[in-house]
A protein has these predicted regions:
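Charged low-complexity intrinsically disordered patches
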Residues: 105-135
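Positively charged, structured surface patches that bind polyanionic biopolymers
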Residues: 1-93, 101-107
Length: 135
């Protein structure tokens, strides 16, 4: 996925308001946005992955953000407490990813684009294989 949805009312969200009032609230918010973009890149239903089979770890996120492991762990715990992310099977997951990101619509759009491209190529092939007869 090359984009993620962020609603214009994000700063009116009580969870975001509470997080922004925390010490280092700006950092927490930035990391939240980074988690959304990483989940969007991995395209695994909101799972926050480094690669197809490797979930993002506290250590990975600390390296990416240049923060300490302790700070990242505290931030992730706050996001879990606010029910913004889940931690299941050693994987951080954006809660309600499908609902907010319309991933199903994105997949449908990709499928429509593939079908449109297939038809275009078929038409190009048919046009290039036309027999010309001379009189």
């Amino acid at each position: 996925m090359q984009w993620i949805k962020i609603f214009t009312s994000i700063f009116g969200n009580p969870k975001i308001q509470l997080l922004l009032k925390e010490r280092d609230g700006d950092t927490i918010f930035r990391i939240w946005i980074q988690l959304l973009t990483i989940a969007g890149t991995s395209m695994q239903g909101g799972k926050i992955m480094v690669s197809t089979n490797k979930p993002l770890t506290v250590e990975d996120l600390a390296k990416i953000t240049q923060k300490t492991n302790k700070k990242i762990k505290n931030i992730l715990d706050k996001l879990i407490h606010c029910e913004m992310i889940l931690f299941e099977n050693n994987t951080y997951i954006i809660k309600n990813w499908e609902k907010y990101q319309s991933a199903d619509k994105y997949e449908k759009m990709l499928e429509q684009n593939r079908e449109r491209q297939r038809r275009y190529r078929e038409n190009q092939k048919n046009e290039n294989n036309v027999d010309v007869t001379l009189r």
